[in-house]
Amino acid sequence: MQTIKCVVVGDGAVGKTCLLISYTTNKFPSEYVPTVFDNYAVTVMIGGEPYTLGLFDTAGQEDYDRLRPLSYPQTDVFLVCFSVVSPSSFENVKEKWVPEITHHCPKTPFLLVGTQIDLRDDPSTIEKLAKNKQKPITPETAEKLARDLKAVKYVECSALTQKGLKNVFDEAILAALEPPEPKKTRRCVLL
């Protein structure tokens, strides 16, 4: 049985572990426990063939910056996560996470994943952001960043309501099995 290795990265507390636990067990964890390193495996059927989807959770905290890349070798696809209600986690996608994974695994496809979409319309969350002159990240803003950073695509979900959750992993599997064709570059030739 073929295994697909999927590694999840992103800032601490954006919901990486909840995403994985909600997907693999259909239960939402009730308390926050910072992750050092965990992995989960699920069997998925693709075109009538069984695949093992190996899901590797990582710690977003800076203390683990030297340890985290040890989980990167042989990765088939990365999920680069940010919370749609945490502008700093969105900023770190381009400042930290994409540079980190492309440094270690330059040819590995990645998806940009917006988490906690159930909070996008939550009045107290919106109020907290407004106090700092911020607002939730829109899908359009995230899609533009995904294009700019050459992500396979942008997907978003809520681990709490499970909205969009299965789609995140379906898209990750597709990206791993059918990595996008490298764009042909045209050279400028002066005669």
Swiss-Prot record:
Cysteine methyl ester carried by residues: 188
Superkingdom of this protein's organism: Eukaryota
SUPFAM superfamilies: P-loop containing nucleoside triphosphate hydrolases
Subcellular location, record wording: Cell membrane; Cytoplasm, Cytoskeleton, Microtubule organizing center, Centrosome; Cytoplasm, Cytoskeleton, Spindle; Midbody
Enzyme class at the top of the EC tree: hydrolase
GO annotation (BP), single: phagocytosis, engulfment
Short sequence motif Effector region: positions: 32-40
Regulation: Regulated by guanine nucleotide exchange factors (GEFs) which promote the exchange of bound GDP for free GTP, GTPase activating proteins (GAPs) which increase the GTP hydrolysis activity, and GDP dissociation inhibitors which inhibit the dissociation of the nucleotide from the GTPase.
Residues involved in GTP binding: 10-17, 57-61, 115-118
UniProt-listed CDD domains: Cdc42
Residue stretch(es) of the prosequence: 189-191
Enzyme Commission number(s) from the entry: 3.6.5.2
GO MF terms, alphabetically ordered: apolipoprotein A-I receptor binding; G protein activity; GBD domain binding; GTP binding; GTP-dependent protein binding; GTPase activity; identical protein binding; protein kinase binding
Reactions catalysed: GTP + H2O = GDP + phosphate + H(+)
Record function comment: Plasma membrane-associated small GTPase which cycles between an active GTP-bound and an inactive GDP-bound state. In active state binds to a variety of effector proteins to regulate cellular responses. Involved in epithelial cell polarization processes. Regulates the bipolar attachment of spindle microtubules to kinetochores before chromosome congression in metaphase. Regulates cell migration. Plays a role in the extension and maintenance of the formation of thin, actin-rich surface projections called filopodia.
Similarity comment: Belongs to the small GTPase superfamily. Rho family. CDC42 subfamily.
Listed name of the protein: Cell division control protein 42 homolog
